[in-house]
Amino acid sequence: MGPVMLDVEGYELDNEEREILKHPLVGGLILFTRNFHDAEQLNELVRQIRDASHERLVIAVDQEGGRVQRFRDGFTRLPAAQSYAALNERYQASRLAQEAGWLMASEMIAMDIDISFAPVLDLGHDCIAIGERSFHECPEIAMDMAESFIKGMRSAGMKSTGKHFPGHGAVRADSHKETPRDERSLNDIRQRDMAIFKDFIQRQLLDAIMPAHVIYSQIDERPASGSPYWLKSILREQLGFQGVIFSDDLSMEGAAIMGSYAQRAQRSLDAGCDMLLVCNNRKGAVSVLDNLSFVKAERISALYHHRGRYTLSELQASDRWKKANQMLTQLQEQWQERA
């Protein structure tokens, strides 16, 4: 399987996209809001993607909840991560987070989608790019909520992706628009932001990790997503992480410091990423495919969903889905009223 995850433009594949998906470097595809009209159309698009590729691709989406939820009509409107602990006592918050993880994963698997890039493990709500996507500013509470969410995902048959290593929450800047700089010491980052990653790796709660397009300037002048120090020395060697490392989208401005699209891809791969996201720029994606040295992404196949297929309507007829949908819809409405 190839190490590149691409996107497509619309509701169905065009001929160019069918050819691109056959490229040996392509190993995954991520879906966005622009790819979604309704559940029936989405189901057909996923079928087209499966049929177009010579190998089984990992199909992904960002279906976190709150403001980052690509598919809405016909699916449960998931609450923002911050809402669980903000509006509930600890036990109930954990219970709701677990049901949200299960429901989100179950709905995506019903569409034959392998993974949602979740959960967000960043701490605090001040960063423009993170905000309500963070479970809490307190590491212990964030760990409790995130662990419950992961347990729910796994019970549905979906693997987890913790993001954004080693922590994006302490910078205000948005890495979609610029390259943020975190001026803290390595010890400060270890004691706070990295603690949740370390704990979850030790307890084997993370199947994949996505590093941040953030420069931690006291440690390395390269973004973590393109830093061998962060990905090989810290994540692989010191923390012992054996799962998949995804780059964040290489079209983000936070990655531009690494050079052209082909250079960003090669540097991220050399730094230790297993799969590279190249989205929202077809020319850049083609440049990556034309220039990247072929590397087989051995770890990626571990992320395929592993539950028997059921339709979305069959899932929505189940008692557990009905109860979870009711609780989470109520929480989402309460959170919107508060906002």
Swiss-Prot record:
Residues 164-185 are annotated as: Disordered. One of its GO terms (molecular function) is beta-N-acetylhexosaminidase activity. Its main location: cytoplasm. InterPro entries: Beta_hexosaminidase_bac, Glyco_hydro_3_AS, Glyco_hydro_3_N, Glyco_hydro_3_N_sf, Glycoside_hydrolase_SF, NagZ_Beta-hexosaminidase. The keyword Flavoprotein does not apply. Keywords: Cell cycle, Cell division, Cell shape, Cell wall biogenesis/degradation, Cytoplasm, Glycosidase, Hydrolase, Peptidoglycan synthesis. Substrate binds at residues 62, 70, 133, 163-164. Residues 171-185 have a biased composition (Basic and acidic residues). It catalyses: Hydrolysis of terminal non-reducing N-acetyl-D-hexosamine residues in N-acetyl-beta-D-hexosaminides. Pathway: Cell wall biogenesis; peptidoglycan recycling. It comes from the Bacteria. Plays a role in peptidoglycan recycling by cleaving the terminal beta-1,4-linked N-acetylglucosamine (GlcNAc) from peptide-linked peptidoglycan fragments, giving rise to free GlcNAc, anhydro-N-acetylmuramic acid and anhydro-N-acetylmuramic acid-linked peptides. This is Beta-hexosaminidase. It comes from Proteus mirabilis (strain HI4320).
